[in-house]
From Swiss-Prot:
One of its GO terms (cellular component) is membrane. It is a single-pass membrane protein. It comes from Archaeoglobus fulgidus (strain ATCC 49558 / DSM 4304 / JCM 9628 / NBRC 100126 / VC-16). This is Uncharacterized protein AF_1560. The chain crosses the membrane at residues 13-35. Keywords: Membrane, Transmembrane, Transmembrane helix. It comes from the Archaea. It is found in: Membrane.
């Protein structure tokens, strides 16, 4: 019979795995926070579009691992006031960047989609970002 003070292997594994998931969740929240802060043009800004591509790849891989989609990213950006969704369907999104440089957002979303292995065409037309999923 096991006493109250002893921990079984299953309990230790569950505690360690839960701590691991909490750390992953916190890291994702921090990366999305800095993404939104960057896209808003706050005091933390990435001046180079190559940095936006790198950030897009990292967040894309993170979203893919967690089963999140492009729709989730655009929803988060709209929630923070960085973009305004003009129209959307299952394979088409039209957004208007509000507090974001459209070219930086284009490079970020392109890298995000590449990291998620989604074939797409991302273009900027008349200050709107058009995303077409192939």
């Amino acid at each position: 019979m096991m006493s109250v003070g002893m921990l079984s292997f299953e309990n230790v594994f569950f505690i360690a795995f839960s701590a691991y998931l909490v750390v992953i969740l916190l890291m994702t929240a921090v990366s999305v926070y800095y993404l939104l802060k960057t896209l808003r043009g706050g005091d933390f800004a990435l001046p180079d579009s190559e940095l936006f591509k790198k950030a897009g790849k990292v967040v894309g891989k993170s979203f893919k691992d967690r089963g999140l989609t492009l729709h989730d990213l655009l929803w988060a950006l709209e929630l923070r006031g960085a973009v305004k969704m003009d129209s959307q369907s299952s394979k088409y999104y039209s957004t208007r960047p509000l507090k974001v440089n459209p070219e930086h957002l284009e490079s970020y979303i392109s890298a995000f989609l590449i990291a998620m292995n989604i074939r797409s065409d991302v273009t900027v037309k008349n200050e709107s970002l058009i995303i077409s999923i192939n």
